[in-house]
Amino acid sequence: MSDRQQVTNARGDRIAIVTGLRTPFAKQATAFHGVSALDMGKMVVNEMLSRSELDPKQIEQLVYGQVVLMPAAPNIAREIVLGTGMDVATDAYSVTRACATSFQSTVNVAESIMTGNIEIGIAGGADSSSVVPIGVSKKLAHALIDLNKARSFGQKLAIIRRLGLKDLLPVPPAVAEFSTGLSMGQTAEQMAKTYNISRADQDALAHRSHSLATETWNAGHLTDEVMAAHVPPYKSFIDRDNNIRENSTIESYAKLRPAFDRKHGTVTAATSTPLTDGASAVLLMSESRAKALGYDPIGYIKSYAFSAIDVWEDMLMGPSYATPLALKRAGMELEDLTLIEMHEAFAAQTLANMQMFGSKKFAAEKLGRNRAIGEIDMSKFNVLGGSLAYGHPFAATGTRLITQVCRELKRRGGGTGLTTACAAGGLGAAMIVEVE
């Protein structure tokens, strides 16, 4: 069996990334305060269809993801179909793979094209940290069920008397891993300590990310991939990411206190991605259908891989496991790549993965390889800035990375690019794209 991955349909058509689009990414409770992930998802898909001048009725499948699920609309994909003028018979379903969610939705649509089931599909993801499901305590939830079944006033009163005042308090969504009880920030701290990632190096990476993102926006490179979003009550709009420190100075980072280990920690708010609202999407087609419709795709999927590791230690090391799989399936080595886009969940996590890419010991002990994945050339790495600057709406980051690297490669005249991300649950994702 060949190690190479054939990302084509039966006719030999490649999977074309026709275009990609996203909303601006906004910090929690700012520009998108009160706007749900569903509304942002409909917003970006509608705008992408409009810009591509594609009849919505031609979309055969939509796979969309969300991490912070809303009980009122658990199948965000189906609701987007119903709210964007697509045929009501359009196949639509939702996925969730933590921070790798829109990598998963992209792969699902790509595989539908590869099998010949469809020719045209949309993938993406959206998340809101400003509109979240607020829960109730376990005791109150139990009591509410019992109250629904109670028949007499006396039975109902007895149930209510079991509750204390603290049982009535709202319960916000959990930020910790279900399996371990550890937050992502605590895991980033663990990785910083384990791999001797200094505070200064974390600050420097964050400063680099914000500085490059500022340069990218000022150069106009994101205009074609970020829409202007008009938000209710439609008296204002946002057309630029609002987390970027446009006047970033390295000295300013040193003033911040550690966020997760106050006494001995090195991870700060500035070296962590903030809670963010946003949505993104990509339009995928078989190569022949894209060309028949007159499109010049921004890229093609060359290979992809997912990985999973233990959650108790190094949980955010996913890129170091998924990347060698994607490279092997593409028949490539790290040095063959033109650009590398790695999700910067935390500066510490990013630097730890970069360190492991170049580690022969890690390759031998964890990957069963006789050579390291490869040393990362910083002239190829996150050249437009990364998630530390842009922000991280969990389900939207994957398709943000894919679109961004494809368009940057297009500006440079073509080449190959790696996109990779860690994700909660010890998950990892990697996708290699090629651009002509």
Curated annotation (Swiss-Prot):
Family the UniProt entry places it in: Belongs to the thiolase-like superfamily. Thiolase family.
Gene Ontology annotations of biological process type: fatty acid beta-oxidation
Cited PANTHER family: ACETYL-COA ACYLTRANSFERASE FADA2 (3-KETOACYL-COA THIOLASE) (BETA-KETOTHIOLASE)-RELATED (PTHR42689:SF1)
HAMAP family in the cross-refs: FadI (MF_01618)
Keyword terms: Acyltransferase, Cytoplasm, Fatty acid metabolism, Lipid degradation, Lipid metabolism, Transferase
Location(s), subcellular: Cytoplasm
Pathway field: Lipid metabolism; fatty acid beta-oxidation
Domain of life, source organism: Bacteria
Active site: 99 (acyl-thioester intermediate), 392 (proton acceptor), 422 (proton acceptor)
Protein name stated in the entry: 3-ketoacyl-CoA thiolase
Species, as recorded: Shewanella sediminis (strain HAW-EB3)
